[in-house]
UniProtKB/Swiss-Prot annotation:
InterPro entries: TMUB1/2, Ubiquitin-like_dom, Ubiquitin-like_domsf. Its main location: membrane. Residues 169-242 form the Ubiquitin-like domain. This is Transmembrane and ubiquitin-like domain-containing protein 1. The keyword Membrane applies. The gene is tmub1. It is found in: Membrane; Cytoplasm; Nucleus. The lineage of its organism: Eukaryota, Metazoa, Chordata, Craniata, Vertebrata. Gene3D superfamilies: Phosphatidylinositol 3-kinase Catalytic Subunit, Chain A, domain 1. May contribute to the regulation of translation during cell-cycle progression. May contribute to the regulation of cell proliferation. The membrane form is involved in sterol-regulated ubiquitination and degradation of HMG-CoA reductase HMGCR. May be involved in centrosome assembly.
Amino acid sequence: MALIEGVGDEVTVLFALVLFFMVLMLAWVSTHTTERAPTHWIRPEPAQGGASSNSQRDFHPGPSQTLTNADPNSETVDSSDSTQSSREFQNAGATPHSEVAFSSSGSTVSTGGSVEYTGAAADSPPDGESHPNFTVSSRDPQAGASSSLRYRGLGDGTTAQSAEEAGTIHLRLKFLNDTERLVTVRLSDTIMYIKRTYFPGQELRVRLIFQGQLLRDDSQTVSSLQLRDGSVLHCHISQHASVPGVGADQANVPLNVGNLLVPLLFLIVMLLWYCQFQYPSLFTGTATACLGGFTLLISAIAFSSYHR
């Protein structure tokens, strides 16, 4: 329904804005005043003080005279300070910043930092392959901070880590009759995808259990459940199909706003009484009487609702 019959709301809003800005402009023009520059009055100097000022002017030496009468030993002191600072800079520059050392077991090289290498020839297998421990560390002598990068040889978990890096892992599905089934899944696969892939037509009857907890949410992914390579999922195939999403529907209970009405009214009444005690000049006798009656009414409503 339009605000004015026969006229669109857009036209009404436009004219209201134009009228508002026109009122602002008229108010600004009517109250605008020009700022005047401050007036400076020059006080004439008395004639008697002319001679004294001239004598004082002749008494004070000029800047050139001050520079001429300066101490001649200042140039010598400045030149000696500059020579001493240059010698200290050369001595500091001659200090070595890099150290190189070699040992029989490994090597250490440092140039503003350090690189350490420790050989592991004694622990190498007979075929000649070795897994050295390699440590690289860089240090900042000025900031005092250090960062290190360490690399160590991989052990028996190389295959599992490579499989997880590739994004696929192997899961063991264990049934009630102690039979197992090895499946390959991706980290981004969901529980419903696993059920549909390996239990086609039975995804509503299959229940997966991991570490004693039933996986109810079929939208969870393998990575969110923190499943690793070789993890065991217990499978139970029930005779009755489970209805998905029942727990979620029960959890989303609508909020009853009617229960919050009485506490909200009590809060408003308390705020009004606080204002009445702090600022009594704002409340007349009639307003105070109405506030008291409203408080009694709210109290009666609250008592009757909670008494039932």
